[in-house]
């Protein structure tokens, strides 16, 4: 089935791409979660609109990505969360928490979908995450998780 992606789907494509996937994957996963719409001839107009919107929000060049990478790696990120006596957190740190902590620390605004946590952060201390700014550029961000 041909579909038009409305959001970036890892391993499949970016918003505005027209891709061919299995019918069940499209009907049961992508379309109900609004990650994609069915492809139609009239949908080609939607593709252009989605691509224009993506272009505005996308980091345009590798130079821009490297500039943001330098700013990100220079920021000291501290995240205060509730924790128990043994240093274990109540819950875990999510990419959305990391994105808001980066912005609060004076860093650039980062989309939470670009933050890659190796595994959920569930303990206090220093942790390293990466931020995929461009297909060829990733920034390493050190996060210090402290008790609130």
Swiss-Prot record:
Keywords: Ribonucleoprotein, Ribosomal protein, RNA-binding, rRNA-binding
UniProt xrefs under Pfam families: Ribosomal_L9_C, Ribosomal_L9_N
Listed Gene3D superfamilies: Ribosomal protein L9, C-terminal domain, Ribosomal protein L9, N-terminal domain
Annotated Gene Ontology cellular component terms: ribonucleoprotein complex; ribosome
GO MF term list: rRNA binding; structural constituent of ribosome
GO biological process, one term: translation
Record-linked NCBIfam families: L9
Summary of the function given for this chain in its UniProt record: Binds to the 23S rRNA.
Stated family: Belongs to the bacterial ribosomal protein bL9 family.
Descriptive protein name: Large ribosomal subunit protein bL9
Species the sequence originates in: Streptomyces avermitilis (strain ATCC 31267 / DSM 46492 / JCM 5070 / NBRC 14893 / NCIMB 12804 / NRRL 8165 / MA-4680)
